[in-house]
């Protein structure tokens, strides 16, 4: 294992006002026309939505406004699910549309369809529910706000890396299952465009955070790509298009096969780290070694984390020192990043080529600096104090520079090198690329070359299907017309460079991209819902 031998090729709902209508609603109900057999894998489910069956009329309050809606739950969106619960969808429709009413200038025919996913940490995503309390505890969640704005909400459950099949043994949610399910849910909606009481299936907007943000971006980038067809056919997805109108992506953990190099380009030289609590839980739950000997210590929850824990991580207070091997490979990864950036031939808004020299400096680095400067300046303009950020230089009330060399120590490192494709195959991402018998795999060239004795490499097709960069601008897949991408200024789950590369690639391919790094924001999503829905309104109502 010598470095010189490397080839650098790189919800529960809240209080409800409920009246039962149609057939009595049951918590475990699924869509009609299931052929009953002893085995779930042999059951065939109808793909035809029936608006007259199994719904409840409910209401909740948003900012003093009573929001009434009809709820259809547990709708199986494929005909041959690998796991029924993980491949079911909730659909919520504003009540006004059943009386031909209008909300926010939308009618039942023009209402956008908001399609959030609950994926985090590449774990299964539960079907979202409207709630008066969001993940941040400061108001309604995205699903309920969407309903208040007149949107139809279609919230699919999605398989993740821990999803088991009907036999209780086979892992059926490994890559690329999550994107296959998200596409299948879109196809279900299109299949039922004339059966749904409301919603414009040409105005579907995805939304997700962290791994869910990556999933949302992947859905937006890969519309109708033929490479996914065998997987969609296997689960009995509707034979329809799966391109969408717009994609909202919070802190996407994406471009995984290059994310390690970007992380070390940013954090190389910082040799201590603070893991997220959900990562410690995840390692302990899978029987993996927990760095720093934290296994079993007070405060480490014994149960497996859920997706929301990954989407809103809490950092451990224990500082862990990187090993000599991790420090060594950090430099290897850092040195590999410029070649990758230069291969992309990215350009900024003015058409300037963004590149890096072998030392890691160059116009791409300046572009990243500008994003942080814009974030800090906007904070200053809103009257916020940025003086605690030692890496930001302010003169006469204006941000004049940011020190990218000082930023990593100030933000702190969350992950040891490699951040994603661990040499010991211990990361959530290694698990995501694992086999049906739950054997984790490598997915990046450098990690595989460095650890070549025991770890198996995921197949190249699966790796391709998980990275939107392989489809944007390829002339074959249909990319969403609009993207909104957010990456917090102190998010260190992945490097801002990775999110910037995604945004630039989309922008260079003619996509309308709204990309921003909010000040003092870590790894999280749905924290700016008024701005999110103003953006959706602006693109949906544009003439």
Task: For each feature predicted by the language model, list its residue ranges.
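Cap/lid segment of the alpha/beta-hydrolase catalytic domain
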Residues: 116-180, 222, 521
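Long, low-complexity, polar/charged, intrinsically disordered or flexibly structured peripheral segments
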Residues: 342-465
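Primarily recognizes the serine-hydrolase "nucleophile elbow" in alpha/beta-hydrolase
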Residues: 191-270, 300, 463
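Short beta-strand element of the alpha/beta-hydrolase
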Residues: 89, 104-122, 126
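Sec-dependent signal peptide cleavage junction
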Residues: 19-34
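Alpha/beta-hydrolase active-site loop
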Residues: 171-195, 528
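Catalytic-loop region of hydrolases
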Residues: 33-108
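C-terminal catalytic histidine-bearing segment of alpha/beta-hydrolase fold enzymes
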Residues: 166, 259-265, 298-385, 488-491, ...
